[in-house]
A protein has these predicted regions:
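A structural "domain/chain start" motif
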Residues: 18-69, 75-93, 180-183
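Short, low-complexity, polar/charged sequence segments that are solvent-exposed and flexible
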Residues: 60-64, 100-105, 152-154, 164-168
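"Short basic amphipathic alpha-helical interaction patches in structured regions
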Residues: 58, 96-100, 148
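Second-shell loop/turn segments in exported
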Residues: 44-53, 70-71, 119-121, 153-160
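Bacterial N-terminal signal peptides that target proteins for export
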Residues: 1-13
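C-terminal/domain-edge helix-coil "capping" segments
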Residues: 4, 22-33, 123-130, 137-183
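Surface-exposed short loop/turn segments
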Residues: 69, 80, 84-142
Length: 183
């Protein structure tokens, strides 16, 4: 199957914004932590988003993920404390694409040959959010695991989309909890 140049350009134009909006995640952990003994959790104060509805969505998504991983909520005597931190940052998004040289075909006279290239550049202001989730050993009072997720925020999203975005972000961040410890 051969892609024609206009179709290839259209495909690239469609994919670039999708790749730019992808969430980046990472995690780190204390290799001495005994994750298999962590059975219960309680939330501690972190750095909330400052928007109660967003904070409620984050807590609900974390509760769902922790429950799926076998942890139960225990506010009086938890094995770990879970904290989350939210940061927002305005950034510039600069993207460009070039059409590349165009071939005009064969022929005599002034009509044939290669054409000029054009490059389009787009600069826009974006809001990037970072969500950090800390799992702190309640007895040692030390961070056992930290997950981070960074993504462009869609400020025009409807509530249902925000629910989905936050739940998806938390799921992706918590994917590597507990970490697979190599012996």
């Amino acid at each position: 199957m051969t892609l024609h140049r206009p179709m290839l350009i259209a495909l690239l134009i469609a994919l670039v914004p999708a790749m730019a909006a992808a969430q980046k995640t990472s995690y780190d952990f204390d290799k001495a932590a005994t994750f298999s003994t962590y059975k219960s959790y309680a939330f501690k104060d972190g750095t909330p988003a400052g928007q109660p509805l967003i904070d409620q969505r984050i807590v609900a998504a974390l509760e769902s993920e922790l429950k799926a991983k076998g942890l139960t909520k225990n506010d009086s005597n938890p094995d770990v404390f879970v904290l989350y931190h939210v940061a927002m940052d305005k950034q510039k998004d600069i993207s460009s694409y070039s059409t590349g040289p165009m071939y005009g075909g064969y022929g005599y006279g002034w009509g044939g040959g290669w054409g000029a290239t054009t490059t389009d550049v787009r600069v826009r202001d974006i809001l990037v959010g970072t969500l950090a989730v800390d799992v702190v050993d309640a007895k040692k009072k030390q961070i056992a695991w930290r997950g981070l997720g960074t993504k462009e925020i869609d400020t025009t999203a409807k509530p249902e989309k925000r629910d989905k975005n936050i739940a998806g972000a938390v799921t992706k961040i918590m994917k590597n909890y507990p970490p697979k410890v190599k012996s």
